[in-house]
Amino acid sequence: MVVIALWGCETDSSDIDKKVREVASAFAEAYFNYDFEEALKWVTDDSEKWLRFAATNISQEDVDSLNAQMKAATVEIGEVSYIDDNTLTVGITVEDFLLKDTLGKPGHIEDEAEYNLTVVKQGKKYLVRMACLPQNERRSHD
């Protein structure tokens, strides 16, 4: 009887992990390819302001760089960590994307960067919660 109960919990955890990975992937693919309308579908209501902020800081030079890019940004989902019952952190690696790291200056194509996304449970859905724009985790450790 105990084995069945443990197996049931593992399945629930596995299902949650899968859902969280899907949400993080959908958000990151949209966000790092500058499809903010699509990214908006995968974030909490209070995160919308950060997507709007990012969208209003794109210059014509950035648009030209995005249009000249030969391939879309790619995202690899890494480790999922539980913070509490309703909050998780998802590590992602993003490749070949336009990095905007200084306001008022054009972005540049970045080969690879690592980010952590916070995913929260709201009702029956999991959504990305942005407290700020995503920050490159590698850069902060240099």
Predicted features and spans:
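Sec-dependent bacterial lipoprotein signal peptides
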Residues: 1-7
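Short, low-complexity N-terminal intrinsically disordered segments enriched in polar/charged residues
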Residues: 7-33, 41
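Structured segments of extracytoplasmic/periplasmic soluble domains
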Residues: 26-34, 42-46, 50, 118, ...
